[in-house]
Structures are given as structure tokens and as C-alpha cells.
């Protein structure tokens, strides 16, 4: 709470999950799927102890997704369906989750780098007009990740459910001209894993079994350090084979798919996406920075988001960066490679890193009036109030 007794709420709206809670906390109070569903046919009023309503949101929508037409209001980190987004916020602030009187609260929201200005304006408008928050702040996700890690300068590799961003931050300011995005993230890896399992002969339904396959992915997938070696192991031995029990009791065996699915992050062509993979994109981003800042960036690469949780990802990233640096900068001179310092930070709680950074920032700033956009300022200026964030509003 701030000095006037107002609650300070932190809400990290991801493409796949909403993480929300309060300033100063170490963990989100609630984490739930960013999902809105409507029943396909009204056959029963209840399933188990869940009542079927015309509109289902979050956890309940996820549990009954096979009976619903489901919709994610956000795509690749950007709001595409504002009506459904409001349903999601109603659920977040309402009795099911935070249960707050929004008029007596301040809120810190997060946004992806390179977010269109229109998107940000609309979010602020909804927060003040629909929910009447007393103060609003919108922070860039990559900057919050670095705050959570106690850094002001570094490169954030943030890979969530809907989008992967590589975002250099210098002295607490994100550098939009150097920010790169890759439209491959958790959801695409899950889809690819479904495809690989179908090829193996297991029958999966893309929407109904999506959650099940996501859980298989989280439990069994990893990033291969040396892909040729992994493929050899998968072909010639059974060391990679793991059994997984599905919710209906069937047992499936998963082998090479364990590393083949996340490989799409490094080789986008596997899922028909053009462009370079995450390692080369990271290398290109740092090399495009000012020559004086490059060493700092190489030493402070911070992983963030659920899709960076694969075992083996940090070491593979480091291996590829060194290889690219050797080939393209040192022109193959191995002697000089020892001077090349690289450090990849993979904090254990990186899944909720953005929320943690937001909770730290909101707590430090809770009583600083010049930090928050206030309802009164919004009434006077409209969306021009965003100038307070240091964001130019066209």
C-alpha cells in the first residue's frame, strides 16, 4: 500500500498467462491462462463442480476448453480483441482473483518492447475510464527483467508463450532501434511437438489436447547442445526415451521429440518461419550496438520468460554465440577467443521475472507522484498523459 492506504497492483499480461499481484511481493498472487471461451453447445449446466456460463475466463475456460470455442485476446504480445481483453481484466480485478476496488488502487502494467503507441493509449484509456484506477504506469517488460536481476544495462532474451524478444537495455532505458522480435515462442513449440507426436502415430487433437502436450513439453523437452550427437542418440539408442502418462491413463513414449521441438527456436525453418534463430538474432543485435557497449552486453545476457526454462538452453546459446563471434568477428582466429567474455544469466525464477521486476519498481515508486499517471491528469489531458512516461505521443 502507498501512504494513502491505496493498494498498488502489478499486472503482467502475457499472451499465454496473466501474472498479477501486489507491489513488494516476491511472487504473483495469481497466475492463470489468458483465455476467454464460449460454449460451443449448451448441453449441460455443470461439468464436475464448474458451472458452464456463456462466457468462461481463465482457469475455468482452460479446464473446459474441449467444450468451448476459445480465444486468446492477445497475439504475439499485442492486444487483438479488446472486448475479450476487458473480460480478462474483469476476471483479474473481480471476486475470482484479486477482488479489489479499482478506484482505490494504482496499477503497474507491462508491455512488450516495440508495442504500437495505439495499443498503449487504449490500455491507459481502459484503465482510467472503465476501471477508474487512481494511478497507472506502463513499463517495458525487458527493463523490469533487468531490475529484478539488479541490473541497469544488459540484453534480455525474453521468450514467453506468444513472442520472443531480444531487447538491449542501457542505463535503464530500452533501445527500441536495436530490439528484435522472433515470432516463435512457447505456443509454437507446443504446436510443433503435437505435430511430431502425430508423426509418431499418437492421436492428438490440436485444441483439446493442447494443454496436455504443453505439460509434456514442460516436463520432458530440452535444448540439445550438439544437435548431430542428439540425433545420433535418438536413432541408435533408447537413452532419450521417456514415458509419460496422459490424463486418460494412456502411456506414451517420447524420444527424439524431446529436443526436436525446442530446436525450432534455433532453426525457425523447421516450423516454416523465415529468418534466423534466437542465437544468431542475439549475436546480430549485440553486434549492431555501439562498439563501446558490446562487451557490457555480452557479459550481461539475461534470460526471461517460460520458454527459456528448457534445460540446456543457456549452454547452447553460449556455444552458438562463441561460434558466431569466432567466425564473423575474429575471422577464425581461435587464439583471440579467450579474451571474449560472455555471461548468460539464467535466474531460477525467470518464468515470473517481469512480474518480480514490476513488483520491485512499483514498491520503490509507490509514493512518488511524478511517477504515476493520475486519473486527474488523464481527465485533463486524455492519452497525452503518456508523455509522463517519457513516451512521445503522436
Curated annotation (Swiss-Prot):
Single GO cellular component term: cytoplasm
Xref: Gene3D superfamilies: 3.30.420.40, Actin, Chain A, domain 4
Keyword rRNA-binding: no
Record keywords, A-Z: Actin-binding, ATP-binding, Cell projection, Cytoplasm, Cytoskeleton, Nucleotide-binding, Nucleus
Intrachain disulfide bonds: none
BP GO annotations: Arp2/3 complex-mediated actin nucleation; positive regulation of double-strand break repair via homologous recombination; positive regulation of transcription by RNA polymerase II
InterPro entries: Actin, Actin/actin-like_CS, ATPase_NBD
Pfam families: Actin
Binding site for ATP: 160-162, 214-218, 305-310
GO molecular function (one): actin binding
Family assignment from sequence similarity: Belongs to the actin family. ARP2 subfamily.
Annotated function: ATP-binding component of the Arp2/3 complex, a multiprotein complex that mediates actin polymerization upon stimulation by nucleation-promoting factor (NPF). The Arp2/3 complex mediates the formation of branched actin networks in the cytoplasm, providing the force for cell motility. Seems to contact the pointed end of the daughter actin filament. In addition to its role in the cytoplasmic cytoskeleton, the Arp2/3 complex also promotes actin polymerization in the nucleus, thereby regulating gene transcription and repair of damaged DNA.
The protein's name in its UniProt record: Actin-related protein 2
Protein's organism: Xenopus tropicalis (Western clawed frog)
